[in-house]
């Protein structure tokens, strides 16, 4: 379903392919992608909601993302790792505040918007 009135003219890209024979055999191919292709936006929580943090360890989302990246970076693509992180934040974290019990047991879920058109893996060092 439509989400607006605008048309995406896209962006023109060029890819050069070098032949092993000589530099004169180089082939340049041209192709077009949507303007917003290959964007990934990750927010610690959904629009309008509080993003929780531990005073000693930092935000739930960033701490979880670091742990997930550390554990899965060699075998798993980034979008899958963000999904793992979102599940962990949503299910394993709850707020606690000994000064203000009204904000205890509150939850959070990260918001991931992907316009990726390919899987993104991190290469080994």
What do these predicted ranges mean?
Residues 1-125:
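Cysteine endopeptidase catalytic domains of the caspase/legumain-like
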């Amino acid at each position: 379903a439509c989400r607006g009135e605008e048309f995406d003219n896209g962006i023109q890209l060029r890819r050069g392919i070098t032949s092993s024979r000589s530099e004169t055999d180089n082939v340049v191919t041209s192709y077009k992608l949507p303007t917003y292709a290959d964007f990934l936006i990750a927010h610690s929580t959904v629009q309008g909601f509080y993003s929780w943090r531990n005073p000693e360890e930092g935000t739930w989302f960033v701490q979880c993302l670091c742990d997930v990246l550390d554990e899965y970076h060699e075998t798993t693509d980034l979008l899958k790792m963000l999904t793992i992180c979102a599940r962990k934040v949503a299910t394993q974290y709850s707020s606690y505040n000994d000064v203000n019990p009204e904000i205890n047991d509150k939850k959070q879920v990260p918001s991931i918007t992907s316009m990726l058109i390919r899987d993104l893996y991190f290469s080994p060092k």
